[in-house]
Amino acid sequence: MSLSRLHIESFRNISSAQLQPGDGLNLIYGHNGSGKTSILEAIYFLGMGRSFRSHLSQRVIKNDDDALTLFANMESGDEQSKIGLRRFRSGDIEVKINGDKVKRLSTLAETLPIQVITPESFSLLFEGPKSRRQFIDWGAFHSDPRFYAAWVNVRRILKQRNQLLRDGSPYSSIQFWDKEFIRYAELVTDIRKQYVDSLNELLKGIIGEFLPQVDVKVSFTRGWDAKTEYAQLLETQYPRDLATGYTVSGPHKADLRLRVGTLPAQDALSRGQLKLLVCALRIAQGKLLKQQIDKKSIYLVDDLPSELDAKHRKLLLQQLADTGAQVFVTAIEPAAIVDSLITPPSKMFHVEQGRVTVIE
């Protein structure tokens, strides 16, 4: 999957921009505040329906404009398609794929798989299990068509179950919901575990490239005792759930554990090593997607020179090239990226005050 044309309108400080990216690495450079990161953000928004920089979508709409508009032509092998999105300041959103209206944002994610490596993405190892569940679920969503519906049902029933607990309902009332909840919870858990097992096979070699002197162990924890049946646990744990007002254990507590020896990776590794570990995780995820469903991710890499030294920049860029994916990289100075590449970028763009110029 790659973008052959990108149109951005009323997004952050970009009034209007047209890009024709290359299939390989696209270098976007400019001063801080020029709008180069906004291009990455716009691509992400087109694939996810939201920003990776702000939870408030209204903030990305330029000045007093009523809406932002994003459009792209996509290519995957011999197949070509079009995707368009308009987000209004009111919160409404319109999405079209090949001219047909799309109701679910999950269809965007399925159509345009995106991986992000930004200064903020390193929080994967620090912000608690939620971000790591999202990491797992990205892969589970793309690898197994059953996952999304099961995940939606888990969230729906969990919300209902927690409300019953807050209302002080007897277990007989909650048990009615538990039968369905258990079925979906176990399916979500099985798909997650299968995905992490597959990821691990690729990850070992990639971590070895980035951190050859470090033995990192990656494991999946499902959110409750592996030796206990979930149905039994929900029943025996009812008094505790009732006291707390929410379901203490379950797939909503799943996690991806990364350890070095007996220590969590975030305690055993330096900040620089942790950055490399996150890069390895993202690279492995993209490679596994290609392996499982023959679809390439699009990589968005923001402010790479400030995050990695020259040696590791070169290593990351080579690993990205090996995926065969389309890559968008930002930098203040182009030399910081160009000097780390074996071959020149497919395309170079300069951004200044929201205006984008292609560099021939």
UniProtKB/Swiss-Prot annotation:
Source organism, top-level taxon: Bacteria
GO terms (BP aspect): DNA replication; DNA synthesis involved in DNA repair; double-strand break repair; SOS response
One GO molecular-function entry: ATP binding
Pfam families: SMC_N (PF02463)
The entry's keywords: ATP-binding, Cytoplasm, DNA damage, DNA repair, DNA replication, DNA-binding, Nucleotide-binding, SOS response
Single GO cellular component term: cytoplasm
Residues that coordinate or bind ATP: 30-37
UniProt subcellular location: Cytoplasm
Keyword ATP-binding: yes
Family label: Belongs to the RecF family.
Function: The RecF protein is involved in DNA metabolism; it is required for DNA replication and normal SOS inducibility. RecF binds preferentially to single-stranded, linear DNA. It also seems to bind ATP.
HAMAP family given in the database record: RecF (MF_00365)
Protein name: DNA replication and repair protein RecF
Organism, scientific name: Shewanella pealeana (strain ATCC 700345 / ANG-SQ1)
